[in-house]
């Protein structure tokens, strides 16, 4: 059984037992988090929501919080002595999908 959920402005296909990394969620490590924005549930029969499937939820356990790889943003304008260098690390949350309830 699989489901398509929406979180952090992105849509993800998830299955039970799968590990996923999503945009940072306000949840404690070791706690459970429930996704209500379930767009589709598949298995023997497929349920497609418009826009969400009524009564469907996906439950996940919060493994840890972390930060992604560092990216460098560099702005430069030639002949004007303008240079700006800035780094960024996106925060994320690692989840393990426990159950898909449809």
Swiss-Prot record:
GO cellular component: cytoplasm; ribonucleoprotein complex; ribosome
An MF annotation (GO) of this entry: rRNA binding
Keyword Ribosomal protein attached: yes
InterPro entries for the chain: bL21-like, bL21-like_sf, Ribosomal_bL21, Ribosomal_bL21_CS
Pfam family, one: Ribosomal_L21p
GO biological process: translation
Keyword 4Fe-4S among record annotations: no
Record keywords: Ribonucleoprotein, Ribosomal protein, RNA-binding, rRNA-binding
Disulfide bonds: none
Family membership noted in the UniProt record: Belongs to the bacterial ribosomal protein bL21 family.
Role this protein plays: This protein binds to 23S rRNA in the presence of protein L20.
NCBIfam families: L21 (TIGR00061)
Subunit structure: Part of the 50S ribosomal subunit. Contacts protein L20.
Protein name: Large ribosomal subunit protein bL21
């Amino acid at each position: 059984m699989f489901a398509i959920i929406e979180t952090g402005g992105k849509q993800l296909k998830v299955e039970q037992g799968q590990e996923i990394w999503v945009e940072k969620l306000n949840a404690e490590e070791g706690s459970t988090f429930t996704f209500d924005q379930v767009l589709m549930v598949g298995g023997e029969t497929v349920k497609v929501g418009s826009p969400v499937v009524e009564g469907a939820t996906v439950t996940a356990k919060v493994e840890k919080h972390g930060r992604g790889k560092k990216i460098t943003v560099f702005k430069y304008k030639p002949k004007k002595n303008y240079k700006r260098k800035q780094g960024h690390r996106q925060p994320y949350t690692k989840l393990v999908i426990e159950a898909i309830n449809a």
